[in-house]
């Protein structure tokens, strides 16, 4: 039978090493307005359909958070009926959390964005602002603008002369891009819509040893706010052949990264055993969506590497075993390294990826649901300014240390 948990006891649980999940069942707009940091949004109407995907082990402690105690308790009862044996409800609901004086934060995909701002302070990642980039483009000096967003975002609007390379593809394709004669000695600028994916993309290229890399401060929003214009309707990234030399460079860089960061590999047979255990396990396919649809490990989530910062609505148990999968090692290692830096404690990479899985005699599933990237919907200049100020403020606590 579900039991209540007091707000301060939930704080203790969330700070512990015990695998658990905190599921906020309020409407998403309420979650965006105020939330418990690292909780996972799952509106009550989606509970039956998605709870087992979010919480892969039904024996884990799981706390349901509604606006009120009645909402929380009802959701915990529903979770128990779905087979979750340790469902709890937050006493007095989200309002009780607030009345206890405990912190909340607003926004969507906050943990990933918080990580990006922390990275910017602690590494740091060199930036370039919109006016500096515009001047560099007009100077005639070689500059490459790599847009790390999804193809759909790029096609809606992009920086003039930008090239769409979704973030997870950057390590694979950068060697080919730099090999073009016109790109000799070029400055490489990585952009997104705002800040996070620009920072992470530039950081990963830096770690590969790529020179003259910059993150575009505030992305396309900052570009517009600086009075610049965006192109519309240009073709985004499409599948294409990457040279063996570029793939080899990515694999070499990934292996060095794994050694430096302590990223561990797992063999296909061991992953198959892990999936059959009682431990919470997420298999995360970090390839591009068309690759996932063509064939993936049963039960795998699709999180293309560039969208990793925004995957918090799929990984509800932060202390679970996470295994990244690609078509070899490179993309899996780059993704696993970021997840480790974000604070996920148990991340490994399927050694050899999908080819190794099938070579070991294991089958693939085909098809599935491609999850579209859902941005924050910021459209007005006032909204852009407010959003960027909010995002920058996430890093203030790290700068003060």
Language-model-detected regions and their locations in the chain:
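Rhodanese-like catalytic fold shared by cysteine-dependent sulfurtransferases
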Residues: 1-21, 25-144, 148-282, 286-401
């Amino acid at each position: 039978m579900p039991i209540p948990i007091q707000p301060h006891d939930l704080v203790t649980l969330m700070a512990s090493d015990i695998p658990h999940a905190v599921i906020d069942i309020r409407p998403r707009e309420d979650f965006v307005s105020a939330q418990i940091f690292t909780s996972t949004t799952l509106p009550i109407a989606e509970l039956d359909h998605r709870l087992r995907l979010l919480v892969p082990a039904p024996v884990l402690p799981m706390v349901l958070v509604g606006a009120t105690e009645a909402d929380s308790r009802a959701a915990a009862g529903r979770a128990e009926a779905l087979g979750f044996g340790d469902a709890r409800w937050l006493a007095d609901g989200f309002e009780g959390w607030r009345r206890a004086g405990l912190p909340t934060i607003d926004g969507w995909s906050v943990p990933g964005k918080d990580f990006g701002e922390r990275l910017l302070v602690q590494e740091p990642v060199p930036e370039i602002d919109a006016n500096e980039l515009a001047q560099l483009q007009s100077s005639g000096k070689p500059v490459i603008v790599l847009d790390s967003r999804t193809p759909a975002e790029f096609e809606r609007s992009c920086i003039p002369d930008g090239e769409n390379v979704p973030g997870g593809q950057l390590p694979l394709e950068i060697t080919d891009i730099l090999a073009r004669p016109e790109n000799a000695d070029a400055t490489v600028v990585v952009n997104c819509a705002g800040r996070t994916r620009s920072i992470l993309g530039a950081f990963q290229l830096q770690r590969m040893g790529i020179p003259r890399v910059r993150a575009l401060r505030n992305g396309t929003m900052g570009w517009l706010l600086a009075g610049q214009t965006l192109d519309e309707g240009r073709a985004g990234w499409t599948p294409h052949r990457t040279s063996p030399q570029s793939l080899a460079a990515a694999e070499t860089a990934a292996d060095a990264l794994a050694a430096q960061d302590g990223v561990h590999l797992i063999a296909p047979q061991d992953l198959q055993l892990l999936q059959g255990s009682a431990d919470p396990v997420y298999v995360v396919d970090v390839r591009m969506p068309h690759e996932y649809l063509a064939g993936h490990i049963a039960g795998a989530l699709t999180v293309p590497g560039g969208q990793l910062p925004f995957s918090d609505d799929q990984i509800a148990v932060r202390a679970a075993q996470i295994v990244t999968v690609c078509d070899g090692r490179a993309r899996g290692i780059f993704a696993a390294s970021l997840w480790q830096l974000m604070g996920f404690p148990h991340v490994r990479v399927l050694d050899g990826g999908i080819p190794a899985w099938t070579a070991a005699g294991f089958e693939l599933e085909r098809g599935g649901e491609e999850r579209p990237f859902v941005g924050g919907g910021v459209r007005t200049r006032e909204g852009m300014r407010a959003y960027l100020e909010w995002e920058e403020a996430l890093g203030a606590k790290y700068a003060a240390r």
